């Protein structure tokens, strides 16, 4: 239903996702949402950090807060938890300098009912809080990938025919 609402597919369409599943037929798939989060601060010498705004510190607050939110998202019966991974962090250039920039590369895997809009709302709320708490910090983000989840349709003719074809070919029940 989510994919139809977002006009990724029409209601009468069938979707066949061929990602590796160890030969098993899966009836649903998590969505994928990628972000580049850009934290801008103010550089200063480490001997006077109060003159700067530490972008890495602000990024760490963002990471902790969004991780806590993901831990409280509902669990999907088949797909499990929505997850967030901070795959890469870049920032700072010398240990004696308050870092004025930090970028976080984030991979979110979303299970129903968690949508990209829900995640973006949480991002925006956390960003506003951090920018208020730490003067001189500005946070922005780019969405660099967005594929919605696919929910199952147990009555699908495609699924029924696929299961029958696999069983006939492999002699194993799916």
Protein language model features and the residues they cover:
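Metal-dependent amide/peptide-bond hydrolase catalytic core
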Residues: 20, 27, 36-174
């Amino acid at each position: 239903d989510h994919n139809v609402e977002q006009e990724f597919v029409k209601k009468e369409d069938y979707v066949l996702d061929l990602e590796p599943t160890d030969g098993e037929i899966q009836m649903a798939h998590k969505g994928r949402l990628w972000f580049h989060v850009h934290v801008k601060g103010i550089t200063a010498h480490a001997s006077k950090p109060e003159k700067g705004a530490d972008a890495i510190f602000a990024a760490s607050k963002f990471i902790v807060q969004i991780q806590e939110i993901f831990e409280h998202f509902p669990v999907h019966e088949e797909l499990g938890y929505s997850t967030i991974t901070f795959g890469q962090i870049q920032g700072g250039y010398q240990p004696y300098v308050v870092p004025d920039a930090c970028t976080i590369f984030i991979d979110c895997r979303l299970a129903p009912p968690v949508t990209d809009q829900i995640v973006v709302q949480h991002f925006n709320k956390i960003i506003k809080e951090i920018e208020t708490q730490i003067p001189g910090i500005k946070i922005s983000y780019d969405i660099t990938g967005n594929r919605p989840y696919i929910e199952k349709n147990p009555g699908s003719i495609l699924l029924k025919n696929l299961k029958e074809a696999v069983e006939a070919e492999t002699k194993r029940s799916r």
